């Protein structure tokens, strides 16, 4: 996933248009970049980033032949499961506030 992109899995169910509009507004307003910086800082401060890098390195070394798609399949659920609850809650709060402010403008 490139910087500035949202996973399309969240848009499943026909909400692609709304999803894309939200993503566009997040990027255009600069909120996407602010949230990305906040996420990186919080993950670094919590030690999650270091732990995840160590886990990823171990998993990569365990593969007989290094396969990036296979590694992503293993790492993605681990990343989602180990994301600190306070980080998830804080970012969801920031997104909710952004939506509240921007839905009034729509």
Curated annotation (Swiss-Prot):
Q: Which Pfam families does the record associate with it?
A: EnY2 (PF10163)
Keyword annotations for this protein, in alphabetical order, are: Activator, Chromatin regulator, Cytoplasm, mRNA transport, Nucleus, Protein transport, Transcription, Transcription regulation, Translocation, Transport
* Cellular-component GO terms for this entry: DUBm complex; nuclear pore; nucleoplasm; P-body; SAGA complex; transcription export complex 2
In which compartments does the protein localize?
Nucleus, Nucleoplasm; Cytoplasm, P-body
Example GO biological process:
protein transport
Q: Does the UniProt entry include the keyword Transcription?
A: yes
HAMAP family attached here?
Answer: ENY2_Sus1 (MF_03046)
Put simply, this protein is called Transcription and mRNA export factor SUS1
Species of the source? Mycosarcoma maydis (Corn smut fungus)
- Supply the source organism's classification: Eukaryota, Fungi, Dikarya, Basidiomycota, Ustilaginomycotina
